[in-house]
Amino acid sequence: MSKKLLLALITTVLFAQTKGGQDMFGAYDIVKEWPKDISTLPGNDKWTYGAGQGVFAESPNRIFMLYRGELPKIPRPRTKMLTDMGPSIQFPIGRLPWRDATTASLPGGGAGGSIPGAPTDGWLGTVGVDAKWENCIVIADANGNIIERWTQWDKILQRPHFVAINPYDPDKHVWIVDDHMGVIYKFSHDGKQLEQTIGTPKVTGADGTHFNRPTFLAWLPDSTMFVADGYNGTRVAKFDKSGKFLLDWGKPGIQPNEKRPGYMNNVHGIAVDPQTRRVFVNDRGNKRIQVFDENGKYLNEWSMGADPSDIHLLYIGADRTLWAADRGTSKMLKYDLDGKFLYSWGIWGDFAGGFWGVHGFSVDQEGNFYTAEVDSGRVQKFRPKPGANPAQLVSKPVYSAWR
């Protein structure tokens, strides 16, 4: 019997013999009141975070968070009767959330506004009163203290979607995808310089200089980069380490039941296996994961289940298993790289430790797990329980260039 299997069996037995309690948050404990609210900044006491778009843990002491600006900090309203809708209808009730941050935050849904921070036609409210476009890139330390704010870049963001550092880049450039601007930004590690922009701002397309609402990035060990493109696009684009366009693949599918290999709708998540160089693509519109070689040759696929399944992103860590965040079921899902389902955890709610709209997640070198949630408008931190079964923890990341 292997040491890993023996440890897993022992841990399972120990948890099974624990008296009382229950398994709410999988193998984790929630770190409450992390990070500090943006309202703690001087003069900002009336505002809180907008929709949580992305999170990336460079280290346990430097965690990047993306928000769609800020929302008014309002206490939960008292329950009231909605007599215009019916005699016994009231809201909010029980533990149900009362404000959906992704609807309330700028720029709203659908296509981008005309300028960064401008609302779309479907957004209802007054800018500066019901939402404001500030503090889109915030960095916290291990204790949740806000240690950096890259407010100088708010003006070039319209809907920041994803943030990460290429794990094979010793200079640790920071990459941010903005799906409404249709571009990918490459910043210096300290955020002082915008070093590269891939894509043409506000001009859609499907080539080496145009995207159609791109969503996520993934890198191979030689820094080859793959772009999931995207909400409206139906392809994967491949670039070399300098940002030179190499090739792309993917054709428009017919959702929600497209079965043809290489046809996609809403390409919203991508991950790579550094050993085999396989590319795992979340074909969100058709509820499946498609697997390709690095040049787009179709290899395999598996279904992510029927409604309410709604996979938002993929991640492959150091243990070479694939984790997916399911916004529809509010669960984290674990698979082997052949698509065999292994484990899941998660609970819906806007209370501390619950999930509501997980749109990004990350793991640091100590195994702490972070989520960014568009609906609840927050980023959360989870700490592994003492003696937690390693097989139930989201794998630590690959950091080969930083060791």
Residue ranges and their predicted role:
Residues 4-13:
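Sec-dependent N-terminal signal peptides
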Residues 17-403:
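Eukaryotic scaffold repeat domains enriched in small/polar residues
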